[in-house]
Amino acid sequence: MSIILGIDPGSRITGYGVIRQNGRHLQYLGSGCIRMSEKELPGRLKQIYAGVSEIITQFQPDVFAIEQVFMSKNADSALKLGQARGSAIVAAVNADLPVYEYAARLIKQAVTGTGAADKAQVQHMVMTMLKLPARPQADAADGLGVAICHANTNKTLIALAGKATGARRGRYR
């Protein structure tokens, strides 16, 4: 049994989802968004770090999973997203959590069955898979999707005993 924290990073809104995996069973523990009120990027990065640290303290996860940066036509946006990811990863590393990274297409495929799913499809499937009473906010659903992807990939990793799956794992120290 493990508690998985999934993060959908963003420089303005960072979504998170926390689930408990017990074998094949997934249980919803919490989700939400860290909304940045600071106007300047350094202040927003500090808010991401503090917010993720608070979530880690509250839920005590065993594992941290985060979406990888995808290539964007706007280089500035991709750089800001990378910095937001870095702030969240540092919070996980400071808590001695193993960090796993997943591509957006892999996350969508794990949740919906197709890597080309839109946000509404991800929201609907997350709601269905976790038996939620209502559709979660889009960024929170994406955070839950990252956690679900890790839970499914982790089962596959165990089954394949370390063969390549497209997931990256690391302990950043």
From Swiss-Prot:
Q: Which residues form a coiled coil?
A: none
Q: Reaction(s) catalyzed by this protein?
A: Endonucleolytic cleavage at a junction such as a reciprocal single-stranded crossover between two homologous DNA duplexes (Holliday junction)
Where it mainly occurs, coarsely classed, is cytoplasm
Transcription regulation among the record's keywords? no
Q: What is its EC number?
A: 3.1.21.10
- Which cell locations does it reside in? Cytoplasm
Q: Which UniProt keywords apply?
A: Cytoplasm, DNA damage, DNA recombination, DNA repair, DNA-binding, Endonuclease, Hydrolase, Magnesium, Metal-binding, Nuclease
Q: How is the cofactor bound?
A: Binds 2 Mg(2+) ion per subunit.
* Annotated InterPro entries: RNaseH-like_sf (IPR012337), RNaseH_sf (IPR036397), X-over_junc_endoDNase_Mg_BS (IPR020563), X-over_junc_endoDNase_RuvC (IPR002176)
Show the GO MF annotations: crossover junction DNA endonuclease activity; DNA binding; magnesium ion binding
Binding-site list for Mg(2+) 2: 67
**One Gene Ontology term, aspect cellular component:** Holliday junction resolvase complex
GO terms for biological process, alphabetical: DNA recombination; DNA repair
Residues at the active site: 8, 67, 139
Q: What residues does Mg(2+) 1 bind to?
A: 8, 139
Q: Which cofactor does it need?
A: Mg(2+)
Q: Which domain of life is it from?
A: Bacteria
> What is its biological role?
The RuvA-RuvB-RuvC complex processes Holliday junction (HJ) DNA during genetic recombination and DNA repair. Endonuclease that resolves HJ intermediates. Cleaves cruciform DNA by making single-stranded nicks across the HJ at symmetrical positions within the homologous arms, yielding a 5'-phosphate and a 3'-hydroxyl group; requires a central core of homology in the junction. The consensus cleavage sequence is 5'-(A/T)TT(C/G)-3'. Cleavage occurs on the 3'-side of the TT dinucleotide at the point of strand exchange.
How does this polypeptide assemble, per the annotation? Homodimer which binds Holliday junction (HJ) DNA. The HJ becomes 2-fold symmetrical on binding to RuvC with unstacked arms; it has a different conformation from HJ DNA in complex with RuvA. In the full resolvosome a probable DNA-RuvA(4)-RuvB(12)-RuvC(2) complex forms which resolves the HJ.
NCBIfam families from the xrefs? ruvC
Q: What is this protein called?
A: Crossover junction endodeoxyribonuclease RuvC
Organism whose genome encodes this protein:
Aliivibrio salmonicida (strain LFI1238) (Vibrio salmonicida (strain LFI1238))
Q: Which gene is transcribed and translated to give this protein? A: ruvC
